[in-house]
Amino acid sequence: MWMKTVFWGLLVFMLVATTMAVEYGARSHNSGPWSWCNPATGYKVSALTGCRAMVKLQCVGSQVPEAVLRDCCQQLADINNEWCRCGDLSSMLRSVYQELGVREGKEVLPGCRKEVMKLTAASVPEVCKVPIPNPSGDRAGVCYGDWAAYPDV
């Protein structure tokens, strides 16, 4: 008899715990498919070398060679988790700034302001026709929200 009581008690406990986890976890910014993109969890951020070259060329108004565009789009499409694509573009952009020693409000390259490079990088998924999710459920082609306005990007 006591085994039945323990069994039912554990069952009720698990149901309550699962319900609470779903309720509170769904509202957490640390849960969801984007949380799998965190390097601390073992995710390997893509260098996006082709996109790096494409964004630099576009920002200064140069023609982007077809091979560079193709490389960038393939590298972006190769990121299996759609939720990680904008984050990887953001990491790529930060590494460009670091490489060039860019400070806030400065030109990244001659004729290319930082804000323009941010918007150029944010639009790469649209240029490449590579799907990315956004919070509204649409599969917009531009990195969503205020990504391009973040001061650290």
UniProtKB/Swiss-Prot annotation:
Its main location: secreted. Endosperm. The disulfide bonds are essential for the inhibitor activity. PROSITE patterns: CEREAL_TRYP_AMYL_INH (PS00426). Residues 1-30 form the signal peptide. One of its GO terms (molecular function) is serine-type endopeptidase inhibitor activity. It is found in: Secreted. Monomer. This is Alpha-amylase inhibitor 0.28. It comes from Triticum aestivum (Wheat).
